[in-house]
Curated annotation (Swiss-Prot):
It comes from the Bacteria. This is Dihydroxy-acid dehydratase. Belongs to the IlvD/Edd family. Functions in the biosynthesis of branched-chain amino acids. Catalyzes the dehydration of (2R,3R)-2,3-dihydroxy-3-methylpentanoate (2,3-dihydroxy-3-methylvalerate) into 2-oxo-3-methylpentanoate (2-oxo-3-methylvalerate) and of (2R)-2,3-dihydroxy-3-methylbutanoate (2,3-dihydroxyisovalerate) into 2-oxo-3-methylbutanoate (2-oxoisovalerate), the penultimate precursor to L-isoleucine and L-valine, respectively. NCBIfam families: ilvD, PRK00911.1. The active site is at residue 472. The modification N6-carboxylysine is found at residue 121. GO terms for biological process: isoleucine biosynthetic process; L-valine biosynthetic process. The keyword Iron-sulfur applies. The gene is ilvD. It comes from Campylobacter jejuni (strain RM1221). [2Fe-2S] cluster binds at residues 119, 192. One of its GO terms (cellular component) is cytosol. Pathway: Amino-acid biosynthesis; L-isoleucine biosynthesis; L-isoleucine from 2-oxobutanoate: step 3/4; Amino-acid biosynthesis; L-valine biosynthesis; L-valine from pyruvate: step 3/4. Keywords: 2Fe-2S, Amino-acid biosynthesis, Branched-chain amino acid biosynthesis, Iron, Iron-sulfur, Lyase, Magnesium, Metal-binding.
Amino acid sequence: MRSDAIKKGHLKAPNRSLLRACGLKDEDFDKPFIGVANSYIDIIPGHYFLNNYAKIIKDEICKNGCVPFEFNTIGVDDGIAMGHEGMLYSLPSREIIANSIETVMNAHQLDALICIPNCDKITPGMLMGALRVNVPTIFVSGGPMASGVTKKGEKISLSSVFEAVGAYEAKKISEEEFKDIECSACPSGGSCSGMFTANSMNTLCEAMGIALEGNGTILALSKEREELLRKAARRICEIALDERFKIRNIITQKAVRNAMVVDMAMGGSSNTVLHMLAISREAGVALDIKDLNFISSKVAHIAKIAPSLNSVYMDDIHKAGGVSAVMAEISSRQGHILELDALTITGESLKERLKNAKIKDENIIRKVDNAYSKVGGLAILFGNLAEQGCVIKTAGIIGERKFKGKAVCFNSQDEAIKGIIKGKVQKGNVCVIRYEGPKGGPGMQEMLSPTSLLMGMGLGADVALITDGRFSGATRGLSVGHISPEAAEGGLIGLLKDGDEIEIDVDAYTIHANVSEEEIAKRKKEFALPQKEVSSRWLRMYQKLVSNASKGAVLDME
């Protein structure tokens, strides 16, 4: 056993003495030691109950002949961190989470790992850390919350509240309606109820085979979710010493491809691109941002979920057959785009896992021949504005897929929010928000507040927004993010001026500023990078080491 390094032989008597102080007995030193990586924190609605979930898992591990050791990671709630300096810390928290998993697991030489993530950066951070450790691993998330319901009977989610801010600013809803939306949107614990970043990543864990069926869709705080926890705990005990189930044997090239196929079919958050690039790097798997358009071109978009379709939420997907039904439909209709021989954590191939899966409600999960789109719900655009690529969630577009407009430039998200409220962005404009990339922020803030303001003010179908920052999974509209190279590293987005004409053609995968080469060269000579004081030592370190978004915004030591 890997854990023999801390428990076997007379030289390890001091180690055992410390473990005895934690309650271990003689017989425990012959059992596998299993790390239970929790992410319990009171301030995140998807995490405040995870202390109880960890207890369920630990009790089951003990019943099945292993010894659990719980430890915790930090967590940041992107919704609560939104709209102030706290958002600078969201993406960097992914690296801290990855480092903490690696540190605890390797410092104590634990044999296997079960991770309990749920929201935002916690799932990808745990995946990255687990891949570094490379022991048998299972992920079991806390689960999505139920959708909210207003007094009028309308189903809503957190994204509805962000958009209500814009509607209230524009005097389109009353104060009473505004309050009702605020108080109704998040009715329970769990990750926010739509296909936002948290649910996207928990769904992709299922697609990659590192989680059991239902991981992405079974509601939080339900009896069914508790049973999933117990199943995961029993399974980690069964495989704790089986090298076939080391996480790098599960998250392979095939698994990463399967994740991106499901991402396209379900219209996942644009953040998944950033995270899957980082995860594939830790797995030693090749994933180039340029490959994603090929996958998208081969995968129909068959499940549309809030915020793209505000009548459908994760619990609806679960009732309609879940992620397995989506994968089964894609595999039966779209050739060999899914790698069906990929190994899952149950020991089954993906093909075996899907053999009984079927769509139970074609109004929720469509057949391929009735898809929302013949291509996937994400696209990568290239052009002089994004030579290394940028990302758009095509599933969230509510207007035209081709757009031409005049730039209105802002050098920060805060500046953009003020400008939008003051009416500086009008129909037909392209709202440009720059110096918000991984280095420029630093931290690559999400632009949910500006996109939601535009949507709530009735401009969502008539304005494009481009940024070197990123978006919440709750964003919709013609919103292009992750522009690389970013402004802080000399990207063309930093040279744009108000009135420059910008063309976006989603179906041609292009984004272009209609500025002559001579004018660009002139602006480069005159350009001076705006100086931004960064008082945080951690953020200065992050700024110095982080790559741009086209590489996953990872800390690059090379």
